Amino acid sequence: MQYVPLRSKYKIGTRQSELALVQTESVIYQLHKFYPDIEYEVIKIKTIGDKNLLDPLANIGDKGLFTKELEVELDRNNIDFVVHSLKDVPSTVLPPNMIIGAILERADPRDAVVIAPWHKKNSLNELPHGSVIGTSSTRRIAQLKLNYPQFIYKNIRGNMNTRWEKLNNRELGYDAMIAAVAGLQRLKWNDRISEIIEPDRVLYAIGQGALGIECRHNDIDTIRMLSVLNHEPTVIRCIAERAFLRRIGGGCSIPNAVRTIYNEKGLVMDGMLLNLDGSRFVKDHVENLDLTVPMTTTKHATTFFVSNSDDELLSIEDETQLTNRSSNQRNLKRKRTESDIDSVLIPPPVQQPPTPPSSTTSATIPSITTTATLTETDVIPLLRHYAHVCGVNINETLLENAELCGTNLAVKLMQLGADSILEEIQQSSVVIPTP
């Protein structure tokens, strides 16, 4: 049975660019299919990233460059939710009272080459050596330098329209620019795409191509209203990607990249971390992971989990280990409340190991069935989420396993030397916030 919203009007926060407004209107269009009588008011807000168009993003020295001001208005209850390009939403720093309430079906996550119109060329390989390629993304620059060392890479800031104008100004010296395929297509600029770069050359950004909707974690009405927009395969992929980034650390200043595929065979995920000039990198993958099987079973122990890992999310414990733990050492386990809207964290009984979620979802929350006696100190109110994503109506085993997959892949990169690359980046001349 479809949820009936409690309000007749919702205020939507968005950036002021044409692309942001197009994306917001696309969300309103989808919502009208389910709630034709609801009114939506669009509130335009300028962010730090919109105000500072001179410095490279990595040099501004802040996370949430395109989200912070929107979150301030959300926190003040001036708006009800925000439409983001999910790649702009930090995985490591999200205000504690905010959550991603829905993720829509992902568009093409790849990067595109847009060549200046006076060049009669169709790909990067056709451009002469020394051509100037415009991009402000450290992820793109590092991978492009690795695969196309013959070019010069130059900062090109601004929204999509501004960057297009800069590319068309011959005095500025750009021969091409790199942009997300999804953004170009949403603006109906398909004819400006000269080449699409395949992920085997340039992996894409975490969440690229997906729209995420951020709201207050205690605004259950909005969360339920938005849940109809969740696209399960996209949610699962993006949770894995965001968990990967959260474990690696960093934001737009750190060249990290992914590729994910989720189908009937399971999840395939590639992850990569590079230094700023692409001369050093670590890369690994996990593949064919059946997310319907709890990751804490032995089925995945040899093919999935990292040996000698100190990461709490990746530890495997047998019943004996759990029984021998003291009460203050027990891992917290997610449990349901009698409410159908919130969940809590409570310690599991010492006598038995944690039981992974089965086929229940966030939309169906039964009563607690445990012999443990709970007190106020035992129960901690917490909205159920995975990498800050609330996947209402999606099997929670899938969501939890997707989060574990991303975390595991990040730990594998750490064991391959990601820590030393991160240290090199932090000591470089680029101003980078500590992850």
Language model features with spans:
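Short, well-structured alpha-helical segments in soluble
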Residues: 64-78, 169
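Detector for glycine-centered tight turns/loop "hinges" at secondary-structure junctions
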Residues: 77, 130, 278-279
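Short, small/hydrophobic-residue-rich motifs at membrane-helix boundaries and re-entrant hairpins
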Residues: 25, 63, 76, 85-86, ...
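A conserved helix-loop-strand patch within extracytoplasmic ligand-binding domains
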Residues: 86-87, 94-150, 199-200, 211
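A short, hydrophobic beta-strand-centered structural micro-motif
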Residues: 72-73, 80-89
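Small-molecule-sensing regulatory modules
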Residues: 1-55, 59-60, 67, 85-89, ...
